[in-house]
Amino acid sequence: MNTDTFMCSSDEKQTRSPLSLYSEYQRMEIEFRAPHIMPTSHWHGQVEVNVPFDGDVEYLINNEKVNINQGHITLFWACTPHQLTDTGTCQSMAIFNLPMHLFLSWPLDKDLINHVTHGMVIKSLATQQLSPFEVRRWQQELNSPNEQIRQLAIDEIGLMLKRFSLSGWEPILVNKTSRTHKNSVSRHAQFYVSQMLGFIAENYDQALTINDVAEHVKLNANYAMGIFQRVMQLTMKQYITAMRINHVRALLSDTDKSILDIALTAGFRSSSRFYSTFGKYVGMSPQQYRKLSQQRRQTFPG
């Protein structure tokens, strides 16, 4: 599958509506193919994970050469302009695009998360943490019509990154430069958005407003909303809602709390708004989601 239509290149502007962007950016995408040289740099609001299986590849990330070694897992926040410049002998490469709100909801090393949101490129110390078989299976399962199978794949990818987090990693590009491309994300914007992401992650379950976020980073609210949407490619309100929905899904799956308690715990203040929002973002009612999750636990016991 090709996710380039969801991305911004250095010589084009993003014209998609925020609502259609959310539907694209909430999805996890996996490509498994031969790498190809990119004619220009591009950027997008997701976390990108690359694993070349049979040879090294070279990227230009924020105008710095980065060698991605065979068998190593490499990840970075893809709002930094990046371009694959040398495919070497590699014929088989996995490319994951992970929604930032999902990445930040997983129990990963806080230093790792901090490095990623501040523009560093991170590489696993160990090789062979992932096989082509797993990548192909996840790619197939993410397109399954069965919600339980799709969620199982997402859970397993989260565990893969948890293993990455625990098994040792190092930064291979520390983003000290301020070079930018025309129409791309400035270092100034990325810095402020990284602060906003941290604040939202800590406070999304409260009565959080856009003004609260803007005040935290000491920016005008309209300016804060503008740079957030430019970097993340969805609105701040959509992002906060996505964090809350992630929390709700976890509590529906893992606890027996009442649905109203769960909604309040995750930061929703109105029962009717919660039901409407959950249905819109997940495609089913909370009751249906809980039932599916319980069935999944019985089908795939931990």
From Swiss-Prot:
Keyword Cytoplasm appears in the UniProt entry: no
Residues of the HTH araC/xylS-type domain: 194-292
Single Gene Ontology BP annotation: regulation of DNA-templated transcription
Keyword Transcription: yes
InterPro entries, sorted: Homeodomain-like_sf, HTH_AraC, HTH_AraC-typ_CS, RmlC-like_jellyroll, RmlC_Cupin_sf, TF_DNA-bd_sf, Tscrpt_reg_AraC-type_HTH
Keywords assigned: Activator, DNA-binding, Transcription, Transcription regulation
Single GO MF descriptor: sequence-specific DNA binding
PROSITE patterns assigned to the protein according to its UniProt record, in alphabetical order: HTH_ARAC_FAMILY_1, HTH_ARAC_FAMILY_2
Residue ranges of DNA binding: 211-232, 259-282
Gene3D superfamilies documented for this protein: Homeodomain-like, Jelly Rolls
Physiological role: Transcription activator for the expression of the melAB operon. MelR binds at two sites located upstream of the melAB transcription site.
NCBIfam families registered for this protein in UniProt: PRK10371.1
Record protein name field: Melibiose operon regulatory protein
Origin organism lineage: Bacteria, Pseudomonadati, Pseudomonadota, Gammaproteobacteria, Enterobacterales
Gene: melR
